[in-house]
Amino acid sequence: MLPFAMTANRPAGESSTYIYRSAEKLSLFLPCARQRFWPGRNLIAGPYAGEFGYELMQWQGFVRARRRHYQAVHVVTYPGREYLYEGCQVHYHAIDLKKAGYGYGLLDPRRTRELADAKAAEIGLRDYDVFDASLLCTRYHKALFWRQDFRLFEEPPLAARPCDVVFHFRAVDKVGSDHFKNYPPALADELVQRCLDRGLSLACIGHPAYSYCPANCVDWRSEDLRRTVAAISTGRTVAGENSGPMHLANLCGKPTILWAQDQWRIDYSLRWNPFRVPIYTAANDSCQPAPEKVLNVIVASLQELAARTENFTRRCYTLPAQPIANA
């Protein structure tokens, strides 16, 4: 990774995210130091308006680590994300996820500060710091000033009997070049039917507006992250295109079966894996792999996991969480 890269190395023209100028990066060392060593009484974290995967594997870990230094922490993020911020007061913004960009998003530092100050005025907050994505703009800022604190997400399962595979079929029309990451419904239907023919028990997760569930699959999609974590907790594996819900599964300690059109995308999950759960690759050259190919990897992965965990009676993650801020 380049020393001052804000996000990983996407191909040229693909990174729809705010790009920091060199002068901006240098100027941000001072506010990082002030907030790190002389924090105010309260903290506004956000507004966060980036990708769900970045919120899971980067942002919320930093916010949790800062929480102990403040009397109160107010997080401004997308609706439905309260579960990620225990001990914080969560507020929603109205930024359209489909137009927010990639990585940490398109908001520039000035606009981010305006929105944070407006929220502070709205709730009558004084003596506050603003922790936003600009303070994480390079690996040096993260390494010098910030730490992450991850917790293992666990909830009681939704069913008494474990589900072999929990799918996430991405289906969001997002502005930018990643629209091709969606798995076509026809392929999802075929994959689910092939799995059922092999005797596998299945379910689907995801936001109802941004994911697809075949008609013959148990529908556990929800806007409530707590319920989604409960659904993941019911599964033995989670399978899907390499996107936010796959990162969520890793934070739940669940093995994942991924596909993506580039290996560098798979590498994200291999590095962003604080609990070191097993990760299997169904395809690293396509977001739309053939259902038969995915099925073969699913079957092989379940067999390997059964042997590794004494027929799923032992956990397959490690504690404590490993640092991944600059991974």
Positions of the model-derived regions?
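Short, polar loop motifs at secondary-structure junctions
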Residues: 77-83, 205-211, 243-244, 262-264
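Acidic donor-binding loop of glycosyltransferase active sites
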Residues: 233-239
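Membrane-proximal basic amphipathic "stem/tether" segments
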Residues: 1-37, 316-327
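A nucleotide-sugar donor-handling region in carbohydrate enzymes
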Residues: 104-166
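Active-site and donor-binding regions of nucleotide-sugar-utilizing enzymes
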Residues: 24-123, 227-230, 245-248
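Short loop/helix-cap segments at secondary-structure boundaries that form the rim of catalytic
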Residues: 82-89, 208-217, 248-250, 267-273
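Catalytic donor nucleotide-activated moiety binding site of glycosyltransferases and closely related
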Residues: 78, 162-175, 181-228
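Nucleotide-sugar donor-binding patch of glycosyltransferase catalytic domains
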Residues: 247-327
